[in-house]
Amino acid sequence: MEPRRLSHELREGESDDLTRRRWIVGLSVLGSAIGGIVGLYQTGVVRRLPDPPSDLFDSSRVDASDYAYSRLQTPDGLLMIGTYAVTAALAGAGGKDRARDQPWLPIALAAKTVYDSFVALKLAQEEWRENEALCAYCQVATLASLVSAALAIPVAAEAVDNLLAERAGKSWAAVTQDRVERPLPTA
């Protein structure tokens, strides 16, 4: 796809898929920002992480613990920046018809967001087990991952349907005629 067309589709296009992708990009940027805040604390740029008033949260203690530095000898907040950036890039890649034209993109995005959700939940479990407290910032990022997965799965299912239809020899017109529209989740 030509860059000009991609730019137009991503910025001005209208579809349920693009709406979902925009939400995922926004949630991923939020996750990266949270990773940045935690990373600033973990590297000594800021001295303390304020928490909401609850005994469940002690972000400064959790993010200074052995747990927070146990992967790749790097503060985990800095790793969060990278992983959420990859998710944002996957959400932003491809045009508005990528479930048909590049089905591996929505499938990869769904796989990444589901994996991230499981990892975030596992890390929350580790946080609690080792510290008897949670990082409030990290739990917001966990929610962002869970919502991103919920948004990514319907389009990945459409992409899988398209791949299966292609293998079965159906034309795209037949697939779209038979396809049931997957509406956005409502609150």
Model-predicted segments: where are they?
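Short amphipathic, positively biased membrane-proximal segments
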Residues: 1-187
